[in-house]
Design a protein with these regions (language model features):
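Cofactor-binding active-site loop characterized by glycine-rich and histidine/acidic residues
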Residues: 1-119, 144, 333-335, 364-373, ...
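Non-catalytic terminal/interface segments that mediate subunit docking, oligomerization
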Residues: 21-25, 260-412, 473-475, 485, ...
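Beta-strand segments within the central parallel beta-sheet cores of soluble alpha/beta enzyme folds
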Residues: 2-3, 28-34, 91-98, 128, ...
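Glycine-rich ThDP/TPP pyrophosphate-binding loop and its adjacent helix/strand module
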Residues: 61-257, 431, 435-540
Length: 540
């Protein structure tokens, strides 16, 4: 399979898909491999046509989308492919991840992939940076020889094994990918022979090229978008420039057809649209018994026991826990003891070379580990205030899942919760820096069929939510949950009704004009119950 961080390069992918016959039915019907079909593809891509309902009027998009055969991520935000590629393939699978040199400036989470990759539970992951030396408005640091050489040294310090090659030559890509795969296999062999230990030197391709290579404006800011100085349809000079540079890229039809037929003649390989990463459909998880009770405790203890039991009941599903640092503080000590931090050199019984807990003080990196683990079971827990830093990565996955559903090919990955705890009602001691409700409020604006926002009040109401969360496909849940000890508000039956209906009347009294007291979450419910008593005393 493939992953591309630069989603706006989708035009090249769509063109290759057409040439190789790697298309979904809606594209195959509209874009045949002939002059008319190719012309229609080019015209549609720049038409920005809209249907009556506001959706795109053609099966194309500005970025990788569910109509793009083999596409698994939009690539709308630079930097997230870098954080996800090592966690995407399962054992026996192979993934090539095309990355951006501009995204290398985004953050350092991408440096840690050798720390997380394990041959025992990960497939082959081959990152390739397209080092074209430019972002949108200016040259990148990697656009200089000194910057590129410094980046190679940086990669080595992070545990990568950099391999530079000519990014202007398609054959060089093939050779480089083969070489990278051989190097990784050799390192795994040395690991098995106890010559090496984790982290293994992870091959990292650097395709040195020029932005806009082969066309007018190459190597300049103009290469980002439409490099011609004017529209060739209306301006003679622009038309001459277009014809001059397009002529150098033109391939004679018979030669192009022969090359396409050669690709089509290869047997025994699935089309990219049918690769396992694009068709994730893990088995429905076996549900563990639910341990309801009626005594006061941290609501998080329900999740702590449930997730450990769920993982044990489903050894065929790879677990990942995203942890920005305080798993034990957030009352998930059982999860930590059972699954342990993934490290290279364990220093306690809570750490293991093969741990399933991805821990880093980088919220985007740890949530990306779970967003990428689409063939397994996932859990992310963080202080509510720090969840805000996950929002962009989460929205990218939600948008793609919603588009998959609209295209008639819904996502098959199993749902899981993003837990916002140590929340605003609990964090007064840390003042406003730790009191931020942005995350759940923003997710309330997402479509309900791909995101639920849930505010359970106690152990039982949180526990009753979990089976459906983990059985639903292509849908995440934001759980805002207290971590301190809280009373048991609900019986088993009430908790299950609340999980099913979304709201529950807990008390009613008095006559006359009703006064509604509405609570969301544990602390509000306590205060509303106190308020109800006092209002009743006043005859309200």
């Amino acid at each position: 399979g493939w992953l591309m961080g630069q989603g706006h390069c989708v035009a090249a992918i769509e063109a290759l898909n057409l040439l190789t016959g790697n298309q979904h039915p809606e594209q195959a019907a509209r874009y045949a491999r002939d002059e008319a079909g190719m012309s229609r593809l080019a015209a549609d891509f720049y038409s920005y046509a809209q249907a009556a309902d506001g959706r795109p009027g053609v099966p194309l998009g500005s970025h990788v989308n569910p109509h793009t055969a083999g596409g698994i991520a939009e690539g709308g935000y630079l930097g997230f492919a870098e954080l996800q590629y090592a966690h995407l393939p399962l054992p026996g699978e192979k993934l090539v991840a095309f990355l951006s040199d501009g995204a290398a400036e985004e953050q350092r989470g991408s440096d840690w992939m050798p720390r997380w990759w394990r041959a025992e539970d990960c497939g082959v992951a081959l990152p390739v940076m397209i080092a074209n030396g430019r972002r949108i408005e200016q040259r990148t640091e990697l656009g200089t020889h000194e910057g590129l050489e410094g980046f190679r040294q940086h990669l080595r310090l992070c545990g990568f094994d950099p391999l530079s090659f000519d990014g202007r030559d398609p054959a060089a890509f093939v050779c480089a990918l083969w070489e990278m795969e051989q190097r990784l296999a050799h390192r795994v062999g040395e690991l098995n022979d106890k010559v090496l230990a984790y982290p293994l030197p992870m091959p990292y391709g650097i395709a040195e090229t020029t932005k806009g290579y082969g066309f007018f404006g190459a190597g300049s800011n103009a290469a980002h978008n439409l490099p011609l100085p004017a529209s060739p349809a209306r301006d003679e000079q622009a038309r001459e420039l277009f014809n001059q540079h397009a002529a150098a890229l033109w391939v004679e039809p018979q030669r192009l057809s022969a090359a396409c037929n050669l690709f089509a003649s290869r047997k025994g390989r699935a089309l990219e649209r049918d690769n396992p990463l694009a068709l994730r459909q893990p088995p429905q998880p076996v549900q563990p018994p639910l341990q309801f009770h009626d005594h006061a405790c941290s609501p998080m203890s329900a999740l702590d026991r449930y997730f450990v039991d769920l993982v044990r009941a489903n050894p065929q599903l790879r677990p990942r826990v995203g942890n920005p640092d305080e798993l034990a503080s957030n009352r998930l000590g059982g999860v930590l003891a059972a699954l342990r931090h993934r490290v290279s050199q364990p220093e306690s019984e809570l750490e293991s070379v093969h741990g399933a807990v991805i821990t880093a003080l980088n919220e985007e990196a740890v949530v990306s580990a779970c967003l990428a683990n689409q063939g397994g079971l996932n859990l992310v827990a963080s202080y509510e205030a720090f969840c805000v830093k996950m929002l962009g990565a989460v929205r990218q996955s939600l948008i793609f899942a919603r588009q998959q559903k609209e295209a008639g090919r819904p996502a098959g990955w199993l749902g899981w919760p993003l837990v916002a705890t140590s929340h605003t009602w609990e964090n007064g001691k840390n003042q406003q820096s730790h009191q931020d409700t942005t995350f759940c409020e923003a997710l309330l604006g997402e479509m309900h069929d791909v995101m639920r926002v849930l505010l359970p009040a106690d152990h039982n109401s949180l526990l009753a939510l979990l089976p459906e969360i983990y059985q639903t496909r292509g849908r995440l849940a934001c759980l805002v949950a207290a971590k301190r000890e809280r009373p048991c508000f609900f019986t088993v039956e009430q908790a299950q009704q609340l999980a099913r209906d979304g709201a529950l009347q807990v008390a009613e009294g008095g006559g006359g004009e009703p006064v509604l007291l509405i609570a969301s979450g544990s602390y509000q419910l306590s205060e509303m119950r106190r308020a109800a008593v006092r209002l009743s005393e006043k005859g309200v």
